[in-house]
Amino acid sequence: IFTQRLNSPLGPMILAATAQGLCGVWFEGQRHGPSDERMRSWTHAASNGLLENARQQLLAYFAGEPHRFELPLDLSAGTAFQQSVWQALLRIPSGQTQSYGDLARLLNKPTAVRAVGAAVGRNPVSIIVPCHRILGAGGQLTGYAGGLWRKHALLKLEGHMGL
């Protein structure tokens, strides 16, 4: 796994990639992020085309440019169910949100709301796989591994009308 750091307006981030694609985008210290021990086995990549492309796309996103991420992803660290949830998140357009229940119904698992929530919380590719676009049933901000203040900031950046 190759890594780079990115200083974002919402705090330092870690970007990680395998030969197959981007496998991680985390805010430093976020819940469910990689441990320091695990990261010690990774290789810092001063020059890596995929990581550099991810960096540029994220900087454009943070600058408020209309954006759709175009990056190969490696989501193989998740279970089949988690991967299905993460793929469903990719279909939620910028500026829109869904509830955990909406996402469970979309996956034809209407009784699996808690399992969907757990998978959303374990998303390893923050922002690009837009788990921040998932809200509680009443439209309230709930759970975000990077902190609710970041979730609010990301939704505001995307022009979510409810904020």
Predicted regions and their residues:
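Basic nucleic-acid-binding alpha-helical/helix-turn surface characteristic of O6-alkylguanine DNA
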Residues: 1-111, 157, 161-163
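Regulatory, non-catalytic segments
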Residues: 114-123
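Major-groove DNA-recognition helix of helix-turn-helix-type DNA-binding domains
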Residues: 128
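Short cysteine clusters
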Residues: 131
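…primarily DNA-binding HTH/wHTH and HhH modules…
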Residues: 137-163
